[in-house]
Amino acid sequence: MSALSRWLLIPPVSARLSERYQGYRRHGASPFSAALGCLWTILAWIVFPLEHPRWQRIRDGHKALYPHINAARPRPLDPARYLIQTLWLVMISSAKERHEPRWRSFARLKDVRGRYHQWMDTLPERVRQKTTHLEKEKELGHLSNGARRFILGVIVTFSLILALICITQPFNPLSQFIFLLLLWGVALLVRRMPGRFSALMLIVLSLTVSCRYIWWRYTSTLNWDDPVSLVCGLILLFAETYAWIVLVLGYFQVVWPLNRQPVPLPKEMSQWPTVDIFVPTYNEDLNVVKNTIYASLGIDWPKDKLNIWILDDGGRESFRQFARHVGVHYIARTTHEHAKAGNINNALKHAKGEFVAIFDCDHVPTRSFLQMTMGWFLKEKQLAMMQTPHHFFFPDPFERNLGRFRKTPNEGTLFYGLVQDGNDMWDATFFCGSCAVIRRKPLDEIGGIAVETVTEDAHTSLRLHRRGYTSAYMRIPQAAGLATESLSAHIGQRIRWARGMVQIFRLDNPLFGKGLKLAQRLCYLNAMFHFLSGIPRLIFLTAPLAFLLLHAYIIYAPALMIALFVIPHMVHASLTNSKIQGKYRHSFWSEIYETVLAWYIAPPTLVALINPHKGKFNVTAKGGLVEEKYVDWVISRPYIFLVLLNLLGVAAGVWRYYYGPENETLTVIVSLVWVFYNLVILGGAVAVSVESKQVRRAHRVEIAMPGAIAREDGHLFSCTVHDFSDGGLGIKINGQAQVLEGQKVNLLLKRGQQEYVFPTQVVRVTGNEVGLQLMPLTTKQHIDFVQCTFARADTWALWQDSFPEDKPLESLLDILKLGFRGYRHLAEFAPPSVKVIFRSLTALIAWIVSFIPRRPERQAAIQPSDRVMAQAQQ
């Protein structure tokens, strides 16, 4: 290259071109690409006046105008990319000039929309102010109970007749479209309204559309003339009916969350009851259990009214010695029947307290746990059980493997943030096995913890409700623990839950038997139905293949009618759930959670339906490590099989599109869209199965807590603790950090009005941020440290409200990215022969995408006079 340039060009130009060539090579360009880049540069110098100020502005704004083209590393077809992007820039610049008045009108519409949102936000307060003085006039207290029931009956009857007409009235396509447009308009009007009225309105609209869809499916969409189409259609209809039942029951369950608040305890402590704290353990490491015991020792409750018990089903001498050392009770069984339930029932024979609080051995209670929960027991004598959330300070496999910890609500947030609160409204709160208090008298009446199923907790609460006792739920986290360490452990835990809930459905069905109210029966039914989602989810993941591979019409209707019924059903359900559940479950994430579990919970739930006594209790492992990032090929095998099946459907769909009957084109397109959506969801499931590296034994907790450090020379510096673990802390010194790595300092933390000192060593100094490692602590110091950190009353309270607002379209985009990420991981960890194919496909897709024009960055102003862009800026 240099010899040729010296022969053709004058020395200064040749030297400059040689420098450019070497620069291209240093940035990774191939010799051919670098030489071709130099050639395009020469042509640009010849054809365009690059020294003109206009071209200089383009050159200076190259990164903004051509964000997908790396000028320092040219590719052979970059001129084509420059040309396509330049034409795109000219088009959007011209469109902007041509439609400027229209954009201004859009701005005015946006302003009107903002005013509408502001008006909606203030509507409840204005209504309250205008109606306060009319409250007495509107009272119906003068009416008899019979008159009230009559009025209510008339309203309900009229509403049911109207709903029946709306659901069953047949429409032609145009009428159906207008009807849906009206409902959609109402939904958009009310969705911004704060308060529960808008949620109720959205539920009514969603139920109207969904019930109408189900009616249409049963009456108009089954092909009775083709056996294959009929069978496939009935299978899909079964799955859709299941989803519709869960949707209706779910709306009922959370229509009016109670949001129970604490009740103050009597000022006279002599009136406070005695409480036993049970910490059952089987094979967990002692280090996992220690923090729970240390925190329990610091619970704010009279010491003569509090007894702490370690229930060791492993019979380990180290646990016995630890219990004796810290002054708590220890119980070990000689036999181990009925697992955790049997362990607790055995301890009930020894404990004599009026109440029993139960914590899993990794759940660390806060100091305020009993003061927050016990007031309700003294107020309501029929209250048998108070449940609080299961909060985790460590990411579960979904959060860790996807990097979504504290960015997206986790799988359990919906249940503990909303569903249990909704259950509380209907007096149907479930006992969840930990972080709960139970009154001994009713527990003894039902024979202790239920042992007939592997979900002994929910079965116990069902028995208490059958006896006429009540339950309660408080949505304020009062304990925190460890999540499952791996996806396989997580799935194993969910399999046990699913099997247990189906066992209850078979052995003690809440729909039958005495003692339950209708609302309680429905709440329990929905909880059990939730774990039957495996088979319906697998049906949804394979349903479009029935048409693409077997030519079976699973929905026997024109594609236009399918769109007019299916899309509104899905959109209204998504919009309503986003409004109700947005703080606790972002849109489309349920698809990922259910897909990951579907294959694994389908067989055990089916077996439990047939033989409810089959199956055993499995202990969920906690406190493990993941030393290297890897794909769990065993877990991901079903997802990959479903991916291949859907790819086969894509191939069949492409063939049908080009060679099938013309009147099936729209049906093929709809089926392919469904398949591509399934592929995205399955890609997300694959992404979850890639276990991220986790080698930290002491899990860090983010927090903002005041503290101070004291040097050995007596100098004291205030600081803020921004994270802590059982082995150290991260702090930010308020001012310049005057400490050195390796230096020993004392950390000062407060609990209430008392200050505690902990010996530490500086292990890292970055500006004013300092990493501290705890020096060996005495037992007393360790107890104090846990109570100053993990057991603080305010440590977990704000976590559940820190998630961003759900935005369905943004959430859908996240799911799309997640799906592609899963396929990238397959390429990364696949065997070499498969990896070559993946890399080739990825490179081909990336090469095609590189020609797609991009919108310029905001800092690049496109001037009308600059419409002729340079093909090269060198």
Report the location of each language-model feature.
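N-terminal membrane-anchoring/stem segments of glycan-assembly enzymes
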Residues: 2-271, 523, 533-537, 660-689, ...
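The conserved acidic donor/metal-binding loop of glycosyltransferases
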Residues: 360-364
